[in-house]
From Swiss-Prot:
SUPFAM superfamilies: Poly(A) polymerase catalytic subunit-like. This is Poly(A) polymerase catalytic subunit. It holds the Pfam family Pox_polyA_pol_C. Induction: Expressed in the early phase of the viral replicative cycle. Its EC number is 2.7.7.19. The keyword Metal-binding applies. GO terms for molecular function: ATP binding; metal ion binding; poly(A) RNA polymerase activity.
Length: 479
């Protein structure tokens, strides 16, 4: 029997908190399920909604001024959401509402509300780079890698972009300045800060509080536009979440990383924003070209890649004094693939203290082998490298999440060989190891190369797991 509790049965304070929140006397089941949430519920109840409404209006004025929404509509949407629990009787939905409201009342002001107050002065820190001088070199390098054959019958997934991306980008530019200890950017926007001729879409970010930020942003968009906003988690991308609107249009995504990982990511400071060091980004680009899908992207729009690569090449030339004279020495390092066991052996003794690197193409096999080694010194850099690294008895063990291209039966294509070398160099940069001579040789090994057709490629590691999501409108959290 679902009876109403009487005041002699339950502690008066807890009952009163729940009763005030629900605007009704809770059932016995509701009381027992919600009593441990009393502290969060009380914070929600005493939260100053008027100040919150004011902050959202200021955010709207600054970042979403072109969205046709009145102040009264924004207020009504906010008050409606903060009273939603009064018309909700499903315990699971009540828990979701409490969790999301708790995020708003405890974090919104510090995360997004702060963007409405006067910002610190921007410290101009740009260096003038001569990107034009690198364009021909970048084009030559990319042309030799433009070897993918596009299957016109292949159905490509469409990436629909929301019209709100430009508004969110404006907000993100300020967010990156205010929260530059916990959020950094990479990709096209970061290169745009170096070279204003770079075109960019959404802003790619790494941060230490991704889930909280995305929830706050999703509600800001919901309150301003009235649209249902959905947050999705993709199982095969580590700690990745994306915000989409009700029509599945992409708004923004983010990777979450630990603070200790954030601390070691190489970065530079431009106009109060930290961006991932373009040297590191260049290595990631070289690594990603081992992915067959990325080569298909190159084939479709080579000029987009050329602008980015030229920018990064000029950065490494200026910063590290790299001389592009074609002297490659031992690059790319020798790579031998065991297709049955899906392991590539890279000979590293010419450059590093460890004599070879065993690159696993299946992450669970690597994890099992590391356990068998009884070694506890592996480094996990999360989505920054999509891999752990371990050096044990002069051998590096690591995982490579991309495809391996073959130029002939059993022969690793030089594009993938360079990608594997870049993957090892990422570790060297993250651990403050030596990498500059190896970097110079790697980049010079990309010069004056003929196109080599792709014979075949390995399949990517299949990641288990299910998609997760937060649906604000339906009060559902599945993770």
């Amino acid at each position: 029997m679902n009876r109403n509790p009487d005041q002699n049965t339950f502690p008066n304070i807890t009952l009163k908190i729940i009763e005030t929140y629900l605007s009704r006397v809770p059932s016995v089941n509701e009381y027992h399920m919600l009593k441990l949430q009393a502290r969060n519920i009380q914070k929600i109840t005493v939260f100053n909604k008027d100040i919150f409404v004011s902050l959202v209006k200021k955010n709207k004025k600054r970042f979403f001024s072109d969205v046709n929404t009145s102040a009264s509509e924004i207020k009504d949407r906010i008050l409606s959401y903060f009273s939603k629990q009064t018309q909700t009787y499903n315990i699971g939905k009540l828990f979701t509402i409490i969790e999301l409201q708790s995020v708003l009342v405890t974090t919104y002001t510090d995360i997004l509300g702060v963007l409405t107050i006067k910002a610190p002065n921007v410290i101009s820190s740009k260096i003038s780079y001569n990107v034009t001088s690198m364009e021909e070199l970048a084009r030559d390098m990319l042309n030799s890698m433009n070897v993918a054959i596009i299957d016109k019958a292949k159905v490509m997934g469409r990436h629909n972009v929301s019209s709100l991306v430009k508004n969110v980008n404006k907000l993100m530019e300020e967010y990156l300045r205010r929260h530059n200890k916990s959020c950094i950017c990479y990709g096209s926007y970061s290169l745009y800060l170096i070279n204003p001729n770079i075109l960019y879409g959404d802003i790619d970010i790494l941060q230490t509080n991704s889930r909280t930020f995305l929830i706050d942003l999703a509600f800001l968009i919901k309150f301003i536009t009235g649209n249902n906003i959905i947050l999705s988690k993709i199982p095969y991308l580590r700690n990745y979440m994306v915000i989409k609107d009700e029509n599945d249009n992409h708004i923004i995504d983010s990777f979450n990383i630990r603070q200790d990982t954030m601390n070691v990511v190489p970065k530079i400071f431009i106009d109060n924003i930290y961006i991932v060091d373009p040297t590191f980004q260049l290595l990631n680009m070289i690594k990603m070209f081992s992915q067959i899908d990325r080569l298909e992207d190159l084939s479709k729009d080579p000029e987009k890649f050329n602008a980015r690569m030229a920018t990064m090449l000029e950065y490494v030339r200026y910063t590290h004094g790299i001389v592009f004279d074609g002297k490659r020495n031992n690059m790319p390092m020798k790579c031998i693939i065991d297709e049955n066991n899906r392991i590539v052996t890279v000979t590293t003794k010419d450059y590093f203290s460890f004599k070879k690197c065993l690159v696993y193409l299946d992450e669970n096999v690597l994890s099992s082998d590391i356990l068998d080694l009884n070694a506890d010194t592996s480094c996990d850099f999360e989505s920054v490298t999509n891999s752990v690294y371990l050096i044990h008895d002069n051998i590096m063990y690591t995982y490579f999440s991309n495809t391996i291209l073959l130029s002939d039966k059993g022969k690793v294509h030089e594009i993938s060989a360079r990608g594997l070398c870049a993957h090892i160099l990422l570790y060297q940069m993250l651990t403050s190891g030596e990498y500059k001579q190896c970097l110079s040789d790697l980049l010079n090994s990309m010069m004056n190369r003929d196109k080599i057709p792709i014979y075949s490629h390995t399949e990517r590691d299949k990641k288990p797991g299910r998609h997760g999501f937060i649906n604000i409108e339906k009060d559902i959290i599945v993770f």
